[in-house]
Amino acid sequence: LIEFYGMTEGGGTCILEAHAHPDKLHTVGRPAEGHDIRLIDESGAEVAAGAAGEVVGHSPGMMTGYHNQPEKTRETEWFDPGGKRFIRTGDIGRFDAQGFLTLIDRRKDLIISGGFNVYPSDLEAVLLEHPGVADVAVVGVPSKRWGETPVAFVVLRAGPGQRDSRPASGELLGWANSRLAKLQRLHSIEFIAELPRSAIGKVLKRELRQRFQAPP
């Protein structure tokens, strides 16, 4: 089994030979031959080895631009100090010591709280460890104090014997925050019947942000 990671616009492809690297199934593989993939921070500088950053890529088959959309094209491009052109993917990732790329989150979903990057996927993974949680999505909402603060929308498990063991929102909040770093702690938890999703199953986090009233 061979898995490919890339964009329709080009900008670099990663390949994972799953049968050859069973210990790397959590990654999207390594850059294909002739493809250059790098990670950059919010300022556009390349990140240090082992650090997370936005995935940008260069490949022989990159698009020249979006048709009649020069501004959108410029927003999608990144150039290294030597003038080499890359395409921004919008994904946040990290390379391991062997050069395998792990995707962490989407850049648009990154929460910047008190000047620190908070990755929703990290918080979601913790909440999914709770036996009463069936599904979860974490979003950043405006905060006068922190700029943004994380809020979790949680779908509780249903079924025989589940109703009596369902946690209250305050109980679940305390449980989660005791397992998170101080800078990651959730502001609140909202229970929801189901997460809004697109036709292809992606969680519509914009709708969740719109549902929540900004905290102080």
What do these predicted ranges mean?
Residues 2-9, 28-31, 139-142, 190:
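Beta-strand->loop->alpha-helix junctions that form or flank phosphate-binding loops
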Residues 14-18, 40-41, 58, 155:
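Short beta-strand-to-turn element immediately C-terminal to the catalytic PLP-Schiff-base lysine
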Residues 30-34, 45-78, 118:
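Conserved ATP/PPi-binding loop(s) of AMP-dependent carboxylate-activating enzymes
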Residues 1-23, 36, 45-46:
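Gly/Ser/Thr-rich phosphate-binding loop
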Residues 36-43, 193-200:
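Active-site and channel-lining beta-strand-loop segments
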Residues 6, 57-59, 64-65, 79, ...:
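AMP-binding/adenylate-forming catalytic core of the ANL superfamily
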Residues 210-216:
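Acidic/polar alpha-helix N-cap and adjacent early helical turns
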